[in-house]
Amino acid sequence: MKIVVTGAIGHIGSYLIRDLASQFPGSEIVMIDNLMTQRFPSLFNLPTSAKYSFVEGDLTSMELNPIFNGVDTVIHLAAITDAAGSVDNAELVESNNFIGTEKVAIACLENACSLITLSSTSVYG
């Protein structure tokens, strides 16, 4: 099984990439992150029961089809989640959260990948 996790070294992603290895031993896990949160330690001491690769990039500007080719599932976690700061950075939040998600969804359709996407409590205001 080949799984892509966007936002892989964020708060939820850093736990998920480890849990996937135990749930799906032998799987290939492709981690995508823009390193905005600078949680580099999340990449250390990954389980050996899965094969990991890391792609640094911005979902709004990167070409996703080559990465999603042959992927079974994409778990889309990449988002700016700072509700308070989003007012001051509305364009950045819209670009990252809306356009990034749209590009992921289109690439999943074009590559016949299933898509799992999450939200946050921030959607409630």
Model regions and ranges:
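NAD(P)H-binding glycine-rich loop region in Rossmannoid oxidoreductase-like domains
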Residues: 59-95, 107
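Active-site catalytic pocket residues across diverse enzymes, especially alpha/beta-hydrolases
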Residues: 20, 24, 93, 108
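N-terminal Rossmann/SDR dinucleotide-binding element
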Residues: 1-73
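Active-site beta-alpha loop architecture of Rossmann-like, nucleotide-cofactor-dependent enzymes
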Residues: 38, 80-84, 122
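SDR active-site strand-loop-helix element
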Residues: 6, 32, 74-78, 115-121
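Conserved Rossmann-fold NAD(P)-dependent oxidoreductase catalytic core, especially the SDR/UDP-sugar
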Residues: 102-125
